Structure formats: structure tokens, C-alpha cells
UniProtKB/Swiss-Prot annotation:
E.C. number(s) listed in UniProt: 7.4.2.11
A Gene Ontology term for the protein's cellular component: plasma membrane
Chief location category: membrane
Protein name: Methionine import ATP-binding protein MetN
Reaction catalyzed: L-methionine(out) + ATP + H2O = L-methionine(in) + ADP + phosphate + H(+); D-methionine(out) + ATP + H2O = D-methionine(in) + ADP + phosphate + H(+)
PROSITE patterns for the chain: ABC_TRANSPORTER_1 (PS00211), ABC_TRANSPORTER_2 (PS50893), METN (PS51264)
Residues engaged in binding ATP: G43, Y44, S45, G46, A47, G48, K49, S50
Protein topology in the membrane: Peripheral membrane protein
Subcellular location: Cell membrane
UniProt domain ABC transporter: residue ranges: 7-246
Length: 334
């Protein structure tokens, strides 16, 4: 089914049972992952992120609901069918999961051996993948001879070996330093752009979402509390969990204690306004100047994401009450 999404969850719940105790990890998840997109799934520890990934590749079975991959059900079908579908899904792990006794080339070749590829074809594919991830010179190196970033690139190449249509990256950069994280994320974007692979990025880091995701699903207590474009979630988060994640990386709105400090420092009225490509503050500040209202930018920041601008600015407005009210009205009308 060419028009089917890459993955679709319909009212999916997952309950783990230990003796007589039950723990619901995911609650009635409805989620459609489009072909060719990078979807970020973010949440704190215990939110259900990894369970969601394991449901996609059939390593866990849902307690209720249905899951389809590329239009094909993976629930209520024989295990042999699930294994067949799993061949079209690549997996990247946080701890690399490389065979220490195999070289970089040997690790990449392993799934091709399992799939029954002939030797000559395997060797050609391994060489192609090593070049793609920039590790041609490390073909004969063992994992202990590689840096963390190089190990993860081997893991990515291995995940791509059989040309899957879907790639699951579960905390793939959590064990890496910031510079190496950037390199791995750039590689994921390259895979998506050049190979057309759909990617699901599981993470607890909003910087990762900002760097690669087209859309983001925010998980909290086993529920999707927000699902929107990455820009929309950053520019105007609707849920408290999304706002908390955005605040960890942007810092463009003063926290309550910072707002109290600013209030003590400035005699004017403090107001925080959101700005973006369509909502500037130039006209409102012109109104302020003409009305004799003094203004000062005391906090804030502006960012660019997906070729669009957004941010928040906190102003101190000082002047006659009616003039300040006129400026506030102008800001509200933007």
C-alpha cells in the first residue's frame, strides 16, 4: 500500500504484569508516522519511549489496539511474519551493541550473512556503507580501537545493511559528547534526505529534537500529550511537559525567580511577548515611543528553526498608565 504511513498505532496500550501487579506503560496511543519523515519521540525516563520503539519492531506485543508497519499489521499475526517484517526495520542502540570480536566491516556484514547474501555482494555492500558513514579507513579496526562516535557510525551502517525503509534510533546519542552527537545527527539527516529512510528518534534531549526532527511527539506518563511540527512545539508548546522540555534549551522566558529579580531591578511594568516571522514588536515599540513610554529589553532570545524565526522578549515599560495600556494593547493586537 503505497499511500499507507510508515507506522500507525490505533488505540495501543501496553500493560506489564508482575504477579498480581499491573503497570500500564502506554495508554491508548494513536500515532501516524508518515513515510520519509523524521519523528522525534521525547519524554523523561519511564514515559514509555523505549516500549513504543519495541512495539514498532515487534519485540513487544500491545495489550490492546493495533499496529501497522507500511500498511501491514504486526499485531495478531504469526511470529514468522513479524520476523519477516522486522527485516525492513533498522535499529540503532545507545550502547552500540557491536561484536567485539568482529571488525567494523565484520559487524556491518553480519546481518547480510544472516540474510543469506552471497559473499561478493556482501563485500560490495559493506564497502558502500563504510564510505557512506565515513569509515572506509576503519574497515579492519575492532570496536575497542574506535571512538564512541565511530562505534555509533558502525552501528548505523549495520542498521542500514539490508536497506530498511524504517530506522529506529533509541537514545542513539546519549553516550556521546556534544561534538560527536552533532556528527551522528548530521548522518541521520543525511540518511533521511539521501536514502529516503523514515526515522524515529527516541530521546530525552530537546537539542536532539531541534537538530533533526520534522515533528515531535511528547510522551508523559505513557500518553502522547503533544504532537506537532518541531517548530510549533518550540515556538508555542501547548502542554506543560512540552514547555518544560523547550525551556531546557531555549531559556528565552524568565523563570519565576528571575522574573522577581527583574521586577525588583526595574521600575516599569514587565511584559513577556512571543515573537516570530509574523509577529514582530517594532510597531508596538513605535507606539510606545510616540506615547512617551520608555521601554527596555530585559530578557529574552530569538532562534531560527526549520527556516523560521521564533522567540520571546521581556520588556520593561515605564510611563503613564494609559500610555502603557495602549502599548500593551498594541502588543496584543499583533
Amino acid at each position: 500500500m503505497s499511500d499507507a504511513p510508515a507506522v500507525e498505532f490505533r488505540s495501543v496500550s501496553k500493560v506489564f504484569r508482575t504477579g498480581k501487579r499491573e503497570h500500564t506503560v502506554l495508554h491508548e496511543i494513536d500515532l501516524r508516522i508518515e513515510r520519509g519523515e523524521i519523528l522525534g519521540v521525547i519524554g523523561y525516563s519511564g514515559a514509555g519511549k523505549s516500549t513504543l520503539a519495541r512495539l514498532i519492531n515487534g519485540l513487544e506485543k500491545p495489550t490492546a489496539g493495533t499496529i501497522e508497519v507500511a500498511g501491514t499489521p504486526i499485531t495478531g499475526v504469526p511470529e514468522a511474519r513479524v520476523r519477516q517484517l522486522r527485516r525492513d526495520i533498522g535499529m540503532i542502540f545507545q550502547q552500540f551493541n557491536l561484536f567485539r570480536s568482529r571488525t567494523a566491516a565484520g559487524n556491518i556484514e553480519y546481518p547480510l550473512k544472516v540474510a543469506g547474501w552471497p559473499r561478493a555482494k556482501r563485500k560490495a555492500r559493506v564497502a558502500e556503507l563504510l564510505e557512506f558513514v565515513g569509515l572506509t579507513d576503519k574497515a579492519r579496526s575492532y570496536p575497542d580501537q574506535l571512538s564512541g562516535g565511530q562505534k555509533q557510525r558502525v552501528g548505523i551502517a549495520r542498521a542500514l545493511a539490508t536497506s530498511p525503509a524504517l530506522l529506529l534510533a533509541d537514545e542513539a546519542t546519549s553516550a556521546l559528547d556534544p561534538e560527536t552527537t552533532g556528527e551522528v545527527l548530521a548522518l541521520l539527516r543525511k540518511i533521511n534526505t539521501e536514502l529516503g529512510v523514515t526515522i524515529v528518534v527516541i530521546t530525552h534531549e530537546m537539542d536532539v529534537i531541534r537538530a533533526v526532527a520534522d515533528r515531535v511527539a511528547v510522551l508523559a506518563d505513557g500518553r502522547i500529550v503533544e504532537l506537532a511540527s518541531t517548530f510549533d512545539v518550540f515556538a508555542a508548546p501547548r502542554s506543560a511537559p512540552a514547555r518544560a522540555f523547550v525551556d531546557t534549551v531555549l531559556h528565552n522566558r524568565p523563570a519565576p525567580e528571575e522574573l522577581r529579580r527583574l521586577d525588583a531591578l526595574h521600575t516599569g511594568r514587565l511584559v513577556t511577548v512571543d515573537v516570530d516571522d509574523k509577529r514582530g514588536i517594532g510597531a508596538a515599540l513605535t507606539t510606545a515611543a510616540r506615547a512617551g513610554v520608555r521601554f527596555e529589553v530585559v530578557y529574552g532570545g530569538v532562534s531560527t528553526l526549520q527556516d523560521k524565526t521564533f522567540g520571546s522578549i521581556t520588556l520593561a515599560l515605564d510611563g503613564p498608565d494609559d500610555a502603557v495600556a495602549a502599548v500593551l494593547a498594541a502588543l496584543d493586537e499583533r
